[in-house]
């Protein structure tokens, strides 16, 4: 350790993931005696936003499957790890986690810390599922420490044989960095709602179902568009707002993408920076998040903080963030009919919406406020390192 500081290298495949899930944690670690290096495929401005507390290294790599990256990246990271002599390599997202686990093991890094945020192989079938499950198991094997995002996902990983129980655990009751209630409470939500609805051409008095995240198949967007179009036949004042980038690696069907572009009541905002997420959520009347799989659901915690009623799926992660019928409503995954039924319920019952929203905010205050989450991570890492 240099100058009594713990040298930590945090890695994600792309910088958007780093921005959304990692940088607040790394900034907190830097304040508490860690020497931090950030490695990812950086977008413009990433280094400038984070260089006040961390060394930033741009490492271009692909999000999708790439044989070229599989050959090159472990070697590049190995040389970086040997040169910098990190005490900890801390990796998140599938591709870079595989590369970093290999490189860290070869370089003799004593703490190889894997944040297992959702298991992509569960959405695959046949040989593809077998291959990607083997990759996940290999990444876990080369890691010294694995942190899963929820208790149910942890148990699933153990049951699937990905990782022995003694190597994998959950920080707090789950999640990553939670929601900044300080930021949520720092702006006028009614003003943000009217301003952003005007910006996107959304009726100010319309009823809005909203989604935040990558617009892809695994997030249940095909089912969401299908359910919304059915609901729209009954209620002409409903709208659907999809906040996030279109995901070419796991796209929705061409038919649904065309529907989203042609329907005057569906709005695609594109990606927005993390600093604007809470304001965009203020446009919504209900958050709809019909994902197939999830680590824990940071966006659900954020929606709770903003005071939104939530519809999400009964899968590991989301079903642990919300209490069904109390702080959220659970639906079956891959089921547009069940989703439609719950969207109709939320539309019809204002009192129920308010009850769900109030309970969700209280739950966010108790478990998911960012200072609580960041302190949990710091204590867990210090305990892991014996400091």
Region spans (language model):
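A conserved mid-protein helix/loop that constitutes part of the nucleotide-sugar donor-binding site
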Residues: 19-24, 207, 211-230, 329, ...
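Glycosyltransferase donor-sugar binding loop
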Residues: 40-44, 175, 212, 239-252
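A short, active-site helix/loop in glycosyltransferases that binds the activated sugar's phosphate group
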Residues: 44-47, 143-183
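Short alpha-helical donor nucleotide-sugar binding micro-motif in glycosyltransferases
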Residues: 81, 271-272, 279-284
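Nucleotide-activated donor-binding/catalytic signature segment of Leloir-type glycosyltransferases, i.e.
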Residues: 253-272
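Short hydrophobic beta-strand element within catalytic cores of glycosyltransferases
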Residues: 300, 309-312, 322
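Conserved acidic donor-binding segment of nucleotide-sugar-dependent glycosyltransferases
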Residues: 324-325, 329-336, 345-350
């Amino acid at each position: 350790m240099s100058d009594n500081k713990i040298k930590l290298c945090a890695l994600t495949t792309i910088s958007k993931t780093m921005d959304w899930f990692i940088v607040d944690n790394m900034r907190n670690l830097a304040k508490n005696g860690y020497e931090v290096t950030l490695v990812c495929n950086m977008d413009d401005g990433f280094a400038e936003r984070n260089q006040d507390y961390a060394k930033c290294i741009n490492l271009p790599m692909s999000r999708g499957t790439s044989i070229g990256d599989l050959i090159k990246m472990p070697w590049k990271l190995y040389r970086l790890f040997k040169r910098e002599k990190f005490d900890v390599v801390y990796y998140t997202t599938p591709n870079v986690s595989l590369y970093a686990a290999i490189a860290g093991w070869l370089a003799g890094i004593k703490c190889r810390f894997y944040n297992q945020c959702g298991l992509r192989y569960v959405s695959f079938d046949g040989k593809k599922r077998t291959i990607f499950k083997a990759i996940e198991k290999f990444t876990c094997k080369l890691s010294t420490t694995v942190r899963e995002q929820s208790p149910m996902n942890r148990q699933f990983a153990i049951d699937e044989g990905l990782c022995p129980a003694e190597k994998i655990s959950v920080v707090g009751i789950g999640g990553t960095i939670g929601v900044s209630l300080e930021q949520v409470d720092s702006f006028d939500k009614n003003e943000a709602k009217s301003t952003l609805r005007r910006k996107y051409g959304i009726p100010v008095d319309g009823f809005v179902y909203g989604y935040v995240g990558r617009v892809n198949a695994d997030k249940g967007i095909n089912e969401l568009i299908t359910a919304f179009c059915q609901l729209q036949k009954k209620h002409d004042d409903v709208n659907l707002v999809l906040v996030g980038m279109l995901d070419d690696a796991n796209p929705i069907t061409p038919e649904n993408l065309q529907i989203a572009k042609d329907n005057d009541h569906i709005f695609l905002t594109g990606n927005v920076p993390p600093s604007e997420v809470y304001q965009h959520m203020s446009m919504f009347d209900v958050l709809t998040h019909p994902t197939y799989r999830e680590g824990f659901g940071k966006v659900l915690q954020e929606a709770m903080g903003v005071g939104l009623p939530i519809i999400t799926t009964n899968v590991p992660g989301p079903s642990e963030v919300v209490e069904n019928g109390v702080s959220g409503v659970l639906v079956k995954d891959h089921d547009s009919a069940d989703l439609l039924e719950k969207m109709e319920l939320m539309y019809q019952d204002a009192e129920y919406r308010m009850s769900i929203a109030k309970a969700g905010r209280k739950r966010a205050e108790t478990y998911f406020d960012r200072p609580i989450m960041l302190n949990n991570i710091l204590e867990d890492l210090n305990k892991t390192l014996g400091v």
